[in-house]
């Protein structure tokens, strides 16, 4: 009887912990306005005519949903020029990662001000923190370059972009349910600036202005509340170069490294192509000669194999962080570049060439393409087969 009562009390305690009320002081109107890029999409007329409180509720609501708290509610109010958030239906410590994000945002704001003082801030840039991410139940960390401006102005969703949408489909191809992919896509951009998608080159000189922000975010997000390391994936050449400059190890595409942003915590990092690189690599206009299309297809198939392997590693490590990173990577490259090359091919032709599934299957069964697939098996024998973008 006593044992049964004790179990019931334990269950009640866990239930209460999962359905607590969290109150958080966000700061002054001025602070919250800049950290939430308010207003997100107003010229003379606002695309969505939201108040500051509604904007904050929107992003905090995204976070609680992506953390898996389906019944959680967010309410934001202003009192004497200070904003406060009340979140119900979340664990008692839920405010801690949110507070850490906003504190890091202050560092980003300072960096942006220095950048502007040096005459390097562009008129069409906006400071944009990774709002709306999974905060408490994140499975892995994605290091990226910068968010496209339309994620802020049109979508008001950090995870709505061609880059993140494509990567989510690759995670799904590796067994992660679509509804759960946001937990794997907690993003840290080394340039916290919403800018036109073509602004990559323009942003190359800004990274050092945000060093305090970048390293703080990596330190805070790369470990769980219990102190365990989360797997990290570094997308694209600028980000992989940043990892080397900041932490030391060289990270090539499908190359593994370990960093220690916190004492005693070893974070596994996998290098990957930028998710959008495949559209450049597979563009026939980038090649010459009568076989330009064939060259583009071959390049695209290689990148698709690399990308599926990287997403496989991310999915596997995120769902079971105790796995050996190198063993997981070997298994993933074997899967997508040796065992399931036909499926790699089909995913390339359906998602990049936009062929119907039946046509993609026929294309991948043709003799010219089958010979190209053998090149995937060759590249799978080498770690870090290419540099990518």
Predicted regions and their residues:
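Bacterial N-terminal signal peptides
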Residues: 8-13
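N-terminal signal peptide c-region/cleavage motif recognized by signal peptidases
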Residues: 15-18
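C-terminal capping/extension of enzyme domains
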Residues: 22-81, 202-212, 244-388
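A polyanion-binding, active-site-adjacent surface
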Residues: 22-231, 237-244, 278
């Amino acid at each position: 009887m006593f044992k049964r009562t004790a179990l019931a009390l334990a269950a009640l305690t866990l239930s209460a912990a999962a359905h607590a009320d969290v109150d958080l002081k966000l700061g002054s109107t001025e602070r919250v306005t800049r950290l939430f890029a308010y207003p997100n999409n107003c010229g003379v007329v606002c695309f969505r005519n939201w108040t500051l409180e509604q904007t904050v509720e929107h992003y905090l609501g995204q976070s609680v949903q992506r953390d898996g708290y389906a019944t959680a509610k967010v309410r934001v109010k202003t009192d004497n020029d200070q904003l406060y958030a009340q979140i119900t239906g979340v664990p008692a410590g839920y405010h801690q990662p949110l507070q850490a994000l906003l504190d890091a945002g202050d560092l980003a704001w300072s960096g942006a001000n220095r950048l502007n003082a040096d005459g390097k801030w562009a008129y069409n840039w906006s400071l944009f923190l990774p709002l709306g991410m999974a905060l408490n139940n994140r499975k892995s960390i994605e290091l990226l370059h910068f968010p496209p401006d339309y994620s802020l102005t049109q979508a008001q969703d950090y995870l709505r972009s061609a880059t993140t949408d494509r990567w989510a489909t690759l995670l799904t191809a590796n067994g992660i349910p679509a509804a759960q992919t946001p937990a794997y896509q907690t993003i840290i951009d080394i340039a916290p600036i919403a800018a036109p998608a073509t602004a990559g080159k323009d942003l190359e000189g800004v990274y050092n202005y945000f060093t305090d922000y970048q390293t703080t975010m990596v330190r805070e997000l790369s470990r769980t509340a219990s102190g365990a390391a989360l797997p990290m994936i570094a997308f694209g050449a600028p980000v992989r170069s940043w990892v080397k400059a900041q932490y030391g190890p060289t990270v090539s595409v499908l190359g593994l490294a370990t960093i220690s942003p916190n004492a005693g915590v070893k974070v596994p990092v996998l290098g990957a192509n930028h998710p959008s690189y495949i559209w450049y690599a597979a563009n026939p206009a980038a090649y010459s000669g009568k076989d330009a299309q064939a060259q583009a297809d071959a390049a695209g198939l290689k990148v698709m194999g690399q990308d599926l392997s990287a997403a496989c590693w991310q999915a596997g490590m995120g769902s079971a962080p105790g796995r050996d990173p190198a063993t997981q990577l070997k298994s993933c490259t074997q899967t997508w570049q040796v065992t399931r090359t036909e499926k790699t091919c089909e995913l390339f032709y359906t998602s990049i060439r936009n062929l119907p599934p039946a046509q993609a299957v026929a294309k991948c069964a043709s003799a010219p393409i089958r010979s190209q697939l053998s090149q995937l098996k060759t590249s799978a024998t080498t770690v870090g087969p290419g540099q990518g973008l």
